[in-house]
C-alpha cells in the first residue's frame, strides 16, 4: 500500500488579503469576531462519528477545504495516536495541518510558549509582518461574547457540496465583500512573496524570540474581550514568521522524533488550543458562502472558550521544558531537509504523472522551496494551473483511510513531535503560497456546535480500539510528509530507497480482504478504470484519471480499481495492466484538477519478459486464487496441467452449488489441495454471498477465455500454420478447455446462462475443425495426409473430452443419465435445478459427440453415420423438447438423401419448445427440390403416354391434319363414374394412374408416393401453386391407397409415424399463419386438415379390412373377467393374433387419435373432404364395430397410484410412438396417463392392448361430442356426420367464380345500347358520365386482352410446330348433332365418361324447330320440315328429361359462360351479340380453353408449342369446323367420335 503523507492545505492569498484588510480596515474587528464564531463552530465539529467503512459511504468523510484545515485535524480521531489527548491537542492552524514527521513540531512548540508581548508597531510592514495571526483573531473572538447561548442546528452532509466543483465556483460570487477585499489586496501579493522567503537559520532565530513572546501574548489575549490594533499587528508578525519557516522534515528527523514520548500529549493539547484560538477572515467568509445563509452563531463561542480555557490551565507546566529539547533538534532537522526533499523528487519521477505547470517560475529554482498548490477555485472563478503537494485525505479527510493508517503508525512510533520543525513548515507554507496570485476556496462541513470535548474524547477512545486491528494492514505504509522538489540530482539514488506515497483522495481498499469474498461478481479484466493507462499522468484539467467517487452520489461507495504504475516500471507491468489483475491498491484522487502523483508501491513485478509478451494471465502474489500458467519454462510459472484434464477430481459432499460453509463445490470438483488451486478459508458465507463470489471469479475466467479465443482465432486466420503456431494453438485449446470445464462444473446455472457449452464447442473445436477441413480441400496431395492426421487427432481429443465431461457431470451433480433417457417431455415430479441444467449440458455434450462422429466419417470419406445418429438420438431422449438434435438428424438425412426423414426432422426441430428457425430455409429448399422432381416425373409420364398415343393413331384416327406444322394427339380416357370424375387439366391422368399403380412394384410405388406426398406438403408449406393442390392431393391419396394394399407394407411403422407427424405439423403451421383470423379455419388450414383426415381415413379403412380378415376364437368366461359384457357368441379377436400389417398401422392410428382428442376444434365441425377421400366418419364407425369384437384384456393394464407411482411389482408401459414423438408441440395437449403392467408380460402384446384401449376410448369420445359424429343404433355404430360431396361442391364453387368473371366481361362487350339505356334511366348526369367513363375503360381493357390473344394466336400460327394434346371430357354438340345423331348423343351421355355441354342457343334453336317456326320453304320441302320438327321435339324431350333427372353428365351453358342445372327458363337475349349462332356455340367451346403462356410455350428455343384441350366440338357444319380449327378447338363429327371413343 502506498505511503500516506500528511498534507497542509493553506490559502496564502487569503492570509495576505486578511492582512491587508487589517492594515486598511481597522474597524472590521466586529466582522472578525463573527468570523471567529463561525470558525469555532467548525472547529468543534466531528463529522467522522465512526471509523471508515468502505461499504457505508458516510457523507461526512471528506473534510479537505482550505478553511477547514484547522478543524480537519481537530475533528478526526483516526489521524493520530491512541491517546485521546493527542487528538484533542493536535497542533494545526488555518495554514498548516498537522503533519507528523514533517516539521510541525516547531510550530507546536512556538505556540506552546506563553505569550508575553502584546504590543507591536502601529503598522504592518517589514518582511515578517505580512499576515494576520489567525490564532490571535480566534482568541479575540473567543473573548468577545463569553455568555452567548448555544444554538443547535441541523447538520448537513458536507460531502455533497465539497465535491461539487460547480457549487464551489458559484460560491465565490456570493460574498461580494470578501472578493473586493481580495481584489484590493492583489497589489500587495508580490511584496509578500518577495519578503516571505527566508533561510532556515534566520527563521530559527526569529522563532526563538517569537516563542518567548507568544506565551505572554496568549495569556493576555485570553482576558481581553476586544482586540486592539497592537494585538492585531503582533498576530500578523507572529503568523508571518511561522509561515515563512515552513519546511519538510526528513525521514531521519522523523526517526529521532519518535523518542519524545513525554511531550506528545502536551503538543497535542497546545495544538488544540491554537487551532481553536483564531481564524482568518477569509475562512469565515467562505464558511458563510457554503452555509448559504450568512448568519452568525455567537452562541457557540461560549462552549469553545470553556473548553480551551481549561486546556490552557493545564499546559503551563509543560511548556517550559520543551524549549531546550526543541532547540537541540533544530540542527538535525535542518541538515536532513535536502535528503527528504530529493526523496520526494525521486518519487515524483517514478510516478511519472506530475508535469510542471505553466506560470510557476520558482518551482525548481531553489533547494529551499517546495511545491504547493492554492485553493481549487479562486473567487474570480478563474482556474489556474498549479501543483498541489498537500493532501486532504491523510490528516483531515473523513472519507479516506489515511487518517486511520497514520494513527496506527503514530502509535508504533511513539507519536513524537517537534515544535521547531512545525515552525519551519509554517514558514515554508508561507513561501509556497506566496507565489500564487489567486486564492482557491474550499469549505469544510462539521458537526453542530453542541459537541463537547467529552464527546470528542469518547470518539477518540472508540477510534483507538479499532486501530490495533488496522495496524497490521498498514505495516507496509511509509510516513507521510510534504513533498519537496529539488534540483540537486546527487541525492536521487538515496531518495529512491525510501519511496513515499502521497496521501490524498480516496483510499481504494478491497471490500473483503480474504479470498472467500469478492466485491464485484464480474470485475473487468482488461485495462484500468478511468482511462489510467501506462505512462499517463494524472495532472491537467480533465486528465487521464476519472472520479472514482461520484460527488453527485455521496452515499455510493467508491469503485475499486487496480493499482497504477509509474512510467519507469511500465515495462515490468505491461502484462499485468493488460490482464487487469487485482494488484496492490492505492489512493486515487477524487478531483480532476490535480497535477503530479507520488509513486505507488505495487509489490513484486513480473520478472519474465517472455511470459509478458505471450500475454498469459497471472495474478500477483496472494491476489491470485487460481494460478493460471504462463509458460512451462518460466521460473514464475506454477505447474501447468496439459490436456486432457488432469486436475484431481472428486465428488463434493453435497450437491448444492453454494453451501453456507465455504463454497465447497466451488473447489470440490478439482481437489482441495491441488497445485495451483489453494484451499479456501472457511468462513460463514451465506449461499447468496458464495454465489456472488463464485460467479465473480467465473466471470474473470470467461473474460480470460475470450482473450485466449481471440489469439486462437488470429492463429487460425493465417494462410499457413507453422509448427510453432500449431503448438501455440494446442496450448491455447488446452487452456480454454480447462477454463470452460471449470466454469461448467462449478456453476452449471451460470454456465447455462452464459452459453458456455456452445461457446466451448465453437471456440475450441468447431472453428479449428472447419479450418482444417478447409485446408484439407485447398492443400495439395503432399500435405493432405498430415492435415488429415491432425484433424483426426483433434476429433479424437474432442471425443475423449466430451466423454470425460459427461462422466464428470454425473459425478458432480449426482445423477445418472440412464435414469433420464426415457423421452419424458413432462415429468410428474420436478427435477432439481442443478440436475436440470446438468441434463441440458449433457445433451449438448452428446450433440457435440455426434458432430465429432459426423466429421470423422466425412474426413474418412465414408457415409456410415450410424454412430453420429446414435448420439443424436440419445440427446433427443434426454430433452425431447429441444430442437437441436432433430436439426442434426435432419443433416444426416440430407447427407444420405433420405428426403422424408429430412423433412420430418426439420419439422420436428421447428415444432419444438425451443425451435431451430434455420430449419425453415432448409425445408424450403427440400420442397423446391421435391417440386422439381415431381415435374420431371410428370413430364416423363406424359412423354410415355404420348408415345403410346402416336403408336395406334392410324387405327384410332388420333391424327387430324396432315400438315406437319399442326399435330393433334388424342388420348382416350378410361371409364370412371361421372360423380367422381375430376375436372381440369388432370382429368385424363387418374384413369391412367389407376392402371399403372397396380402394375408398379412396392419400392417404385413407395418412391412415387413419397415424392407426391412431399410435393403436396410443399405447396401447403410455401403456399405456392395452390391452384393445382387438389390434383396433387388426389394423386397422393391414390398412391397411398395403393401402397396400403401391399403386404407386407413397404412403409413400416416408423415411416408411417413420420407421415402422420408431417400431416400434424402442416396443420400446426397453417394454424400459426392463420392467427388473428378468429375462430374460423383458414382455407390453408382447411386443406391441410382435409388431407390429414383423408389419409387417416384410408388407414382406418385398411385397419378395418385387416380386422375382418383376422380369425376369431371363443374366449373362456373365467378369462373374460370384467370383459364378460362383450358379445362372445361369434367369438372374439385376440390382440396376440393381430396380423403384422395391422400391428404396423396401430401406432399411427393411436397417435392421430391422440391429436384429435387434444384438438377437437380442428375436425369438429368436419371439414370438406377431398377428391378420392373416403368417408372418414363412416370408416371410423366401421372400425368401432370391428373393435367391439376385439378382446384387449389379454394383458391387464394398471393406472398409477394416487401419489403418481405404481407398485414395485409393476413396470411402466411406454409406447415407442410416445417416445418418438415426445416433445412434439402439436401432441403436448394430448392426454398422457402413466400405464403399468406386470413384470412378466409380453411388452409387444401389452403395447397393442394399450393402443386398442386408447382407440376404443377415442371412438367413444366421438360418440360423446356435443354434436356426435358417431352413434350406436340398431346394434352397431353409424356415422352421424352430414354427407358431403366435396368434389362437386368445390368444382361448382370454382366454376361459379370463374363464371362470374366471364359474365362481367361478357356484359361489357354486350349491347352498348342496353347499357346506355340503363344509364339514362336512373341517376343524374354526373352518374351517367361516370358510368360511361367506366364503360369505356373496361371496353379498352377487353380490347387489350383480345389483342393479346390475337398475338398469341399469331405466334401459334406463324411459329414452329403446334402440338395439341386432346383429352376429351367436355363435348359440345351443335344443333345439327341433335337433329341428325340423337342416338349417338344418348350413348355418350349414358357411358358417363364425358360431360355433355349444351349451349343455350342450341336449345333455343331446337325449341324453334320443334314448333315449326323455321319452316318457310315450299311445299316440296314439307316432308323434310316435318322430319326436322319431329327430331327437334325428340331432342327437346331428351334434354328436358335429362335435366329433370339432374344427370351430372349434362349441363347447359349460356353465351356468357354461366352453367345452368335446369332449362325451365332457357330464353336468352342475344340481340347485342356479335356474329351468328355458330359464333356463340364456338364461344362456349372457348370457355373451356383456358390457355396460359407458361403452359404451352416451349422449353427449348425451337421446340413445338403444345396446347392441351379437354373440349371437343361435335359438328358436321363445315363453316363451324373451319372456325373451330382457326381457334385451335378440336372438332369431330359424332359418328367418328363414337368410333374413336369406342362407345356403342
From Swiss-Prot:
Listed Basic and acidic residues bias regions: 25-48, 108-141, 177-209, 249-273, 283-330, 338-369, 421-432, 458-495, 547-558, 936-947
Every PINc domain range: 1369-1522
UniProt biased composition (Polar residues): 223-244, 976-986
Matches recorded under SMART domains: PINc (SM00670)
EC class name: hydrolase
GO molecular-function terms, A-Z: endonuclease activity; telomerase RNA binding; telomeric DNA binding
Ranges for region Disordered: 25-503, 536-573, 936-964, 976-996
GO biological process, one term: chordate embryonic development
A cellular component annotation (GO) from this entry: chromosome, telomeric region
Alphabetical UniProt keywords: Chromosome, Cytoplasm, Endonuclease, Hydrolase, Nonsense-mediated mRNA decay, Nuclease, Nucleus, Telomere
InterPro entries found in the cross-reference section: DNA/RNA-bd_Est1-type, Est1-like_N, Est1/Ebs1-like, PIN-like_dom_sf, PIN_dom, TPR-like_helical_dom_sf
Alphabetized Pfam families for the sequence: EST1, EST1_DNA_bind, PIN_4
Broad class of where this protein is predominantly found: nucleus
Disruption phenotype: Morpholino knockdown leads to a phenotype ranging in severity from weak to severe that are developmentally delayed with disturbed brain patterning, necrosis in areas of the brain, aberrant eye development, impaired somitogenesis resulting in stacked somites, perturbed yolk sac extension and posterior axis extension with a high mortality rate of 93% at 5 days post-fertilization.
EC number: 3.1.-.-
Keyword Cytoplasm assigned: yes
Biased composition, class Low complexity, residue ranges: 389-400, 562-573
SUPFAM superfamilies tied to this protein: PIN domain-like, TPR-like
Localization: Nucleus, Nucleolus; Chromosome, Telomere; Cytoplasm, Cytosol
Entry text on domains: The PINc domain confers endonuclease activity and is expected to bind the catalytic metal ion.
Function statement: Component of the telomerase ribonucleoprotein (RNP) complex that is essential for the replication of chromosome termini. Required for normal embryonic development.
Name the record gives this protein: Telomerase-binding protein EST1A
Classification lineage: Eukaryota, Metazoa, Chordata, Craniata, Vertebrata
Amino acid at each position: 500500500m502506498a505511503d500516506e503523507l500528511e498534507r497542509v492545505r493553506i490559502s496564502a492569498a487569503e492570509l495576505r488579503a486578511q492582512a491587508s484588510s487589517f492594515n486598511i480596515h481597522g474597524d472590521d474587528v466586529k466582522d472578525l469576531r463573527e468570523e471567529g464564531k463561525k470558525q469555532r463552530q467548525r472547529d468543534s465539529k466531528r463529522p467522522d462519528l465512526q471509523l471508515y467503512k468502505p461499504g457505508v459511504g458516510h457523507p461526512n468523510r471528506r473534510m479537505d477545504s482550505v478553511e477547514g484545515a484547522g478543524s480537519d485535524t481537530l475533528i478526526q480521531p483516526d489521524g493520530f495516536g491512541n491517546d485521546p489527548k493527542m487528538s484533542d491537542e493536535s497542533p494545526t492552524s488555518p495554514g498548516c495541518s498537522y503533519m507528523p514527521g514533517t516539521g510541525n513540531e516547531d510550530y507546536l512548540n512556538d505556540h506552546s510558549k506563553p505569550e508575553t508581548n502584546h504590543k507591536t508597531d502601529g503598522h504592518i510592514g517589514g518582511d515578517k509582518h505580512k499576515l494576520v495571526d489567525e490564532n490571535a483573531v480566534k482568541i479575540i473572538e473567543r473573548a468577545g461574547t463569553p455568555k452567548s447561548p448555544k444554538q443547535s442546528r441541523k447538520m448537513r452532509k458536507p460531502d455533497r457540496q465539497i465535491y461539487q466543483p460547480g457549487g464551489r465556483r458559484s460560491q465565490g460570487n456570493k460574498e461580494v465583500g470578501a472578493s473586493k477585499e481580495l481584489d484590493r489586496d492583489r497589489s500587495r501579493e508580490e511584496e509578500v512573496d518577495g519578503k516571505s522567503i527566508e533561510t532556515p537559520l534566520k527563521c530559527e532565530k526569529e522563532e526563538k524570540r517569537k516563542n518567548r513572546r507568544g506565551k505572554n501574548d496568549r495569556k493576555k489575549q485570553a482576558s481581553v474581550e476586544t482586540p486592539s490594533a497592537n494585538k492585531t499587528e503582533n498576530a500578523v508578525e507572529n503568523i508571518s514568521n511561522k509561515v515563512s519557516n515552513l519546511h519538510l522534515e526528513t525521514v531521519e528527523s522523523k526517526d529521532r522524533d519518535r523518542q519524545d514520548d513525554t511531550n506528545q500529549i502536551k503538543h497535542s493539547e497546545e495544538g488544540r488550543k491554537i487551532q481553536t484560538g483564531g481564524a482568518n477572515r477569509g475562512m469565515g467568509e467562505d464558511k458563510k458562502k457554503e452555509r448559504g445563509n450568512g448568519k452568525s452563531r455567537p452562541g457557540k463561542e461560549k462552549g469553545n472558550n470553556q473548553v480551551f480555557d481549561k486546556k490552557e490551565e493545564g499546559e503551563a507546566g509543560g511548556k517550559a521544558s520543551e524549549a531546550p529539547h526543541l532547540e537541540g533538534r533544530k540542527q538535525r532537522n535542518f541538515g536532513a531537509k535536502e535528503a527528504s526533499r530529493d526523496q520526494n523528487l525521486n518519487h515524483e519521477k517514478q510516478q511519472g504523472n506530475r508535469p510542471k505547470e505553466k506560470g510557476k517560475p520558482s518551482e525548481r529554482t531553489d533547494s529551499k522551496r517546495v511545491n504547493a498548490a492554492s485553493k481549487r477555485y479562486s473567487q474570480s472563478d478563474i482556474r489556474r494551473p498549479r501543483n498541489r503537494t498537500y493532501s486532504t485525505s491523510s490528516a483531515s479527510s473523513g472519507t479516506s483511510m489515511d487518517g486511520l493508517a497514520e494513527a496506527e503508525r503514530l502509535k508504533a512510533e511513539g507519536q513524537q513531535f517537534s515544535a521547531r520543525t512545525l515552525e519551519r513548515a509554517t514558514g515554508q507554507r508561507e513561501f509556497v503560497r506566496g507565489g500564487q496570485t489567486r486564492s482557491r476556496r474550499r469549505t469544510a462541513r462539521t458537526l453542530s456546535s453542541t459537541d463537547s470535548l467529552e464527546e470528542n474524547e469518547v470518539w477518540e477512545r472508540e477510534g483507538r480500539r479499532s486501530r490495533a486491528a488496522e495496524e497490521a494492514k498498514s505495516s507496509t505504509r511509509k510516513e507521510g510528509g510534504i513533498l519537496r522538489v529539488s534540483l540537486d540530482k546527487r541525492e536521487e539514488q538515496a531518495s529512491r530507497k525510501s519511496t513515499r506515497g502521497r496521501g490524498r483522495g480516496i483510499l481504494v481498499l478491497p471490500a473483503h480482504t480474504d479470498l472467500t469474498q469478492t466485491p464485484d461478481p464480474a470485475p473487468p479484466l482488461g485495462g484500468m478504470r478511468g482511462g489510467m493507462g501506462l505512462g499517463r499522468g494524472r495532472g491537467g484539467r480533465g486528465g487521464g484519471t476519472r472520479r472514482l467517487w461520484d460527488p453527485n452520489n455521496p452515499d455510493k461507495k467508491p469503485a475499486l480499481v487496480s493499482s497504477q504504475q509509474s512510467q519507469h516500471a511500465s515495462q515490468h507491468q505491461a502484462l499485468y495492466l493488460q490482464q487487469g489483475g487485482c494488484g496492490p491498491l492505492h489512493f486515487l484522487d477524487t478531483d480532476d484538477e490535480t497535477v503530479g502523483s507520488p509513486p505507488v508501491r505495487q509489490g513484486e513485478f513480473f520478472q519474465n519478459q517472455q511470459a509478458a509478451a505471450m500475454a498469459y494471465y497471472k495474478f500477483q502474489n496472494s491476489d491470485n486464487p487460481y494460478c493460471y500458467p504462463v509458460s512451462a519454462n518460466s521460473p514464475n510459472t506454477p505447474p501447468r496441467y496439459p490436456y486432457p484434464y488432469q486436475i484431481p477430481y472428486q465428488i463434493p459432499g453435497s450437491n448444492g452449488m453454494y453451501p453456507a460453509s465455504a463454497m465447497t463445490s466451488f473447489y470440490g470438483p478439482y481437489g482441495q489441495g491441488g497445485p495451483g488451486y489453494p484451499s479456501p478459508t472457511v468462513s460463514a458465507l451465506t449461499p447468496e454471498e458464495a454465489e456472488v463470489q463464485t460467479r465473480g471469479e467465473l466471470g474473470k475466467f470467461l473474460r480470460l477465455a475470450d482473450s485466449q479465443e481471440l489469439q486462437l482465432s488470429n492463429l487460425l486466420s493465417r494462410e499457413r500454420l507453422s509448427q510453432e503456431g500449431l503448438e501455440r494453438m494446442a496450448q491455447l485449446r488446452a487452456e480454454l478447455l480447462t477454463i470452460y470445464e471449470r466454469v461448467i462444473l462449478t456453476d452449471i446455472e451460470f454456465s447455462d446462462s452464459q452459453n458456455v457449452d456452445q461457446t466451448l464447442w465453437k471456440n475450441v473445436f468447431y472453428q479449428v475443425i472447419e479450418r482444417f477441413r478447409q485446408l484439407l480441400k485447398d492443400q495439395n496431395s503432399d500435405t493432405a495426409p498430415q492435415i488429415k492426421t491432425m484433424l483426426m487427432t483433434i476429433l479424437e481429443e474432442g471425443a475423449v473430452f466430451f466423454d470425460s465431461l459427461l462422466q464428470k457431470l454425473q459425478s458432480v451433480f449426482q445423477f445418472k443419465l440412464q435414469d433420464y433417457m426415457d423421452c419424458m417431455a413432462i415429468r410428474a415430479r420436478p427435477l432439481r435445478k442443478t440436475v436440470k441444467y446438468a441434463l441440458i449440458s449433457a445433451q449438448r455434450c452428446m450433440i457435440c459427440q455426434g458432430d465429432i462422429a459426423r466429421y470423422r466419417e466425412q474426413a474418412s470419406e465414408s457415409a456410415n453415420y450410424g454412430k453420429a445418429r446414435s448420439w443424436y438420438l440419445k440427446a433427443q431422449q434426454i430433452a425431447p423438447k429441444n430442437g437441436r438434435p432433430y436439426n442434426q438428424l435432419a443433416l444426416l438425412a440430407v447427407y444420405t438423401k433420405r428426403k422424408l426423414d429430412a423433412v420430418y426432422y426439420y419439422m420436428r426441430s421447428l415444432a419444438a419448445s425451443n425451435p431451430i428457425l434455420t430449419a425453415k430455409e432448409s425445408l424450403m429448399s427440400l420442397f423446391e427440390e421435391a417440386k422439381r422432381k415431381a415435374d420431371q416425373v410428370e413430364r416423363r409420364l406424359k412423354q410415355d403416354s404420348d408415345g403410346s398415343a402416336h403408336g395406334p393413331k392410324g387405327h384410332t384416327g388420333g391424327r387430324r391434319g396432315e400438315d406437319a406444322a399442326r399435330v393433334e394427339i388424342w388420348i382416350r380416357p378410361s371409364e370412371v363414374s361421372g360423380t367422381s370424375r375430376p375436372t381440369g387439366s388432370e382429368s385424363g391422368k387418374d384413369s391412367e394412374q389407376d392402371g399403372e399403380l397396380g402394375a408398379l412394384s412396392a419400392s417404385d410405388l413407395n418412391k412415387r408416393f413419397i415424392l407426391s406426398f412431399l410435393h403436396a406438403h410443399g405447396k401447403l408449406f410455401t403456399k405456392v401453386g395452390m391452384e393445382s393442390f387438389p390434383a396433387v392431393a388426389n394423386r397422393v391419396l391414390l398412391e397411398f391407397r395403393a401402397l396400403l394394399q401391399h403386404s407386407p407394407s413397404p412403409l413400416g411403422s416408423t415411416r408411417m409415424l413420420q407421415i402422420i407427424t408431417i400431416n400434424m405439423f402442416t396443420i400446426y403451421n397453417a394454424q400459426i399463419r392463420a392467427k388473428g383470423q378468429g375462430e374460423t379455419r383458414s382455407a390453408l388450414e382447411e386443406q391441410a386438415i382435409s388431407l390429414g383426415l383423408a389419409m387417416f381415413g384410408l388407414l382406418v379403412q385398411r385397419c378395418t379390412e385387416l380386422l375382418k380378415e383376422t380369425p376369431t376364437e371363443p374366449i373362456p368366461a373365467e378369462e373374460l373377467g370384467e370383459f364378460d359384457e362383450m358379445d362372445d357368441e361369434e367369438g372374439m379377436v385376440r390382440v396376440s393374433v393381430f396380423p403384422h400389417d395391422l400391428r404396423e398401422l396401430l401406432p399411427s392410428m393411436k397417435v392421430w387419435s391422440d391429436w384429435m382428442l387434444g384438438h377437437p376444434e380442428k375436425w369438429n365441425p368436419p371439414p370438406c373432404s377431398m377428391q378420392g377421400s373416403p368417408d372418414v366418419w363412416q370408416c371410423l364407425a366401421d372400425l368401432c364395430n370391428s373393435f367391439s369384437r376385439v378382446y384387449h384384456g389379454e394383458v391387464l393394464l394398471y393406472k398409477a397410484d394416487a401419489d403418481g407411482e405404481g407398485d414395485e411389482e409393476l413396470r411402466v408401459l411406454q409406447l415407442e410412438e410416445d417416445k418418438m414423438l415426445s416433445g412434439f408441440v402439436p401432441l403436448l395437449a394430448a392426454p398422457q396417463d402413466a400405464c403399468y403392467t406386470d413384470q412378466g408380460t409380453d411388452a409387444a402384446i401389452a403395447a397393442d392392448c394399450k393402443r386398442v384401449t386408447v382407440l376404443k376410448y377415442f371412438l367413444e369420445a366421438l360418440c360423446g361430442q356435443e354434436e356426435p359424429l358417431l352413434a350406436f343404433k340398431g346394434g352397431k355404430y353409424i356415422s352421424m356426420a352430414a354427407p358431403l360431396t366435396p368434389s362437386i361442391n368445390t368444382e361448382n364453387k370454382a366454376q361459379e367464380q370463374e363464371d362470374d368473371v366471364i359474365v362481367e366481361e361478357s356484359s361489357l362487350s354486350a349491347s352498348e345500347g342496353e347499357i346506355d339505356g340503363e344509364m339514362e334511366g336512373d341517376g343524374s348526369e354526373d352518374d351517367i358520365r361516370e358510368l360511361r367513363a367506366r364503360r369505356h375503360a373496361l371496353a379498352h381493357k377487353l380490347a387489350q386482352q383480345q389483342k393479346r390473344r390475337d398475338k398469341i394466336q399469331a405466334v401459334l400460327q406463324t411459329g414452329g410446330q403446334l402440338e395439341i394434346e386432346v383429352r376429351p371430357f367436355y363435348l359440345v354438340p351443335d344443333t345439327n348433332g341433335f337433329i341428325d345423331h340423337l342416338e349417338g348423343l344418348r350413348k355418350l351421355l349414358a357411358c358417363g365418361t364425358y360431360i355433355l355441354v349444351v349451349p343455350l342457343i342450341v336449345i333455343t334453336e331446337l325449341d324453334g324447330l320443334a314448333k315449326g317456326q323455321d319452316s318457310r320453304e315450299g311445299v316440296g320441302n314439307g316432308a323434310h320440315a316435318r322430319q326436322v320438327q319431329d327430331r327437334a321435339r325428340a331432342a327437346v324431350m331428351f334434354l328436358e328429361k335429362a335435366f329433370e333427372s339432374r344427370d351430372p353428365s349434362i349441363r347447359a351453358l349460356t353465351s356468357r359462360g354461366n352453367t345452368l342445372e335446369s332449362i325451365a327458363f332457357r330464353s336468352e337475349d342475344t340481340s347485342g351479340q356479335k356474329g351468328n349462332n355458330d359464333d356463340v356455340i364456338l364461344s362456349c367451346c372457348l370457355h373451356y380453353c383456358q390457355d396460359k403462356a407458361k403452359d404451352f410455350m416451349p422449353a427449348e428455343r425451337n421446340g413445338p408449342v403444345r396446347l392441351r384441350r379437354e373440349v371437343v366440338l361435335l359438328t358436321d357444319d363445315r363453316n363451324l369446323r373451319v372456325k373451330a380449327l382457326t381457334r385451335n378447338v378440336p372438332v369431330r363429327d359424332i359418328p367418328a367420335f363414337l368410333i374413336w371413343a369406342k362407345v356403342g
